[in-house]
Design a protein with these regions (language model features):
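Short alpha-helical donor nucleotide-sugar binding micro-motif in glycosyltransferases
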Residues: 229-230, 237-242
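Conserved donor-binding/catalytic core segment of Leloir-type glycosyltransferases
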Residues: 123, 157-176, 182-187, 196
Length: 344
């Protein structure tokens, strides 16, 4: 059960779609049920629709509910928990969203905790998510980690001569750190670089407006491009031309765009959130603290200004590339988790 369009090209939806496809390839029958797009702040009609969707599922069936919806409908989950084998698929707990105010997070945590206590299994997309769920004191045996995969990809060719091509792959919203990135880049304006930002521009219009205004105020409009959501083929072209991937995110539970970059042997400058420090290590990029613009600017200055360093980090990225999990691996782990749900 997924709120909105599962073909949406953001991390959580990509995960859901790829794992569903992988399970089908393993012989599982997968039926995606679409919930109203108003989640995680559902209207009464959206909750009624979700109740009806669950009511229409055969008793005893396995049901995976995406975290974007689960924590916002604890009463709906509780009403069907004894009849269905419900698994929560937790990307980012709603109560852990850093863009929400503390009072809102407290209310959301209470609702999310009730929903999680009712399900039979909790599937998390990384150990960072697992840590964020510690507040709910879930039994250890009920939580299973199924990390995202990557697709085998050719090594990126890079930007060649001229400005260093930077690529940031992230929807523009409060948690992704675009303001910090622009500020950091303004501090290394004397370096030769260009930045392409690929990611949805409709999710958080207020933040998009702030970022565009900031780009103009800093005089970066000729060096920073926001292309919006790209097709897979167009995004692959930008990966192929990138010399560095930049991920300034304030909060990730894994870091799929970083993993996709490493799958192409592209070095990374990123913030230390989610699985990014583990993915990148010390060999494939430079990792800086979250919300530390000075450190981000320093890392960018080093990576942009030192071609030998970029070559060294690219060699490290190629080594990491060889050991990244695939989407087939993710599907196999999900199948094992769901099989255990069926015999519990």
């Amino acid at each position: 059960m997924v709120p909105g369009d599962i073909t949406t090209r953001t991390g959580g939806y990509i995960y859901d779609a790829r794992v569903a496809d992988g399970l089908r390839s393993l012989g599982w029958t997968i039926d995606v049920r679409t919930l109203d797009g108003s989640f995680p702040r559902p209207s009464p009609a959206a909750l009624a629709h979700a109740m009806g969707v669950l009511a229409g599922i055969t008793a005893g069936a396995r049901v995976i509910v995406d975290s974007l919806a689960l924590g916002a409908m604890p009463d709906v989950i509780a009403a069907h928990a004894s009849r269905l084998r419900i698994a929560a698929l937790m990307h980012l707990p709603l109560a852990a969203d850093v863009s929400a105010d503390p009072d809102t997070r407290a209310d959301v945590a209470a609702a999310e905790g009730r929903a999680l206590s009712a399900v039979s299994l909790v599937i998390v997309t990384g150990t960072a998510t697992e840590a964020l769920l510690s507040r709910y004191r879930l039994p250890a045996g009920r939580v299973v980690v199924v990390e995202p995969g990557t697709d085998p990809a050719p090594l990126a060719r890079g930007s060649g001569a001229g400005p260093v091509a930077l690529l940031c792959v992230a929807a523009v919203h409060r948690g992704k750190g675009h303001e910090a990135l622009l500020q950091a880049l303004s501090e290394v304006a004397n370096r030769g670089w260009r930045l392409v930002c690929a990611g949805d521009l409709t999710r958080d219009p207020d933040m998009v407006g702030r970022v565009m205004t900031m780009r103009t105020r800093l005089g970066l409009q000729d060096r920073v491009s926001f292309l919006g959501d790209l097709s897979a083929s167009d995004l692959n072209e930008h990966y192929d031309r990138a010399a560095l991937i930049v991920s300034p995110s304030r909060q990730e539970t894994y870091g799929m765009a970083v993993a996709d970059a490493l799958a192409r042997g592209i070095p990374v400058v990123a913030t230390a959130t989610g699985a990014i420090p583990k993915l990148v290590g010390s060999e494939a990029g430079l990792v800086v603290p979250v919300d530390d613009t000075a450190s981000l600017a320093g890392a960018l200055s080093r990576a942009i200004g030192d071609a030998d360093l970029r070559r060294l980090l690219a060699a490290g990225a190629r080594r990491v590339r060889a050991r990244l999990p695939t989407w087939d691996d993710a599907a196999a782990r999900m199948a094992a988790a769901l099989t255990s749900l069926g015999t519990s």
